[in-house]
Amino acid sequence: MQACMVPGLALCLLLGSLTEAKPLQEYDPYAEPPAMPYWPFSTSDFWNYIQYLQTQGAYPQVEDLARTFFAHFPLGSTLGFHVPYQED
C-alpha cells in the first residue's frame, strides 16, 4: 500500500509544478482596482492609430490601445477597471 502512495504523491507534486497551478485569490475588500488609463486624444485619433497598427500587424498593441480607450466608457467596468458613476 505504501509502495503505491509514495510514487503517487511524487507524481502529484511533479504534475503540480509542471502545470504551474496557482491557488485562487480570495476576495479582498480593501484591494484597490487598477487605475483607469488616461486617453487625452479624440475618437478619430483612436481609429487612426488602430488603422496604422493594423497595417503594421501589431495586434497586441491594438488590444492595449482599445483597452485604454474603452475604459473611459461605462463598459470599462467589464474590462477590469472601476468606472465612477456618470450622470447623463
From Swiss-Prot:
Pfam families: OTOS. The keyword Protein biosynthesis does not apply. Ear specific. Its main location: secreted. It is found in: Secreted. Residues 1-21 form the signal peptide. Keywords: Secreted, Signal. The keyword DNA repair does not apply. GO terms for cellular component: extracellular region. GO terms for biological process: sensory perception of sound. May be essential for the survival of the neurosensory epithelium of the inner ear. Belongs to the otospiralin family. This is Otospiralin. It comes from Cavia porcellus. The lineage of its organism: Eukaryota, Metazoa, Chordata, Craniata, Vertebrata.
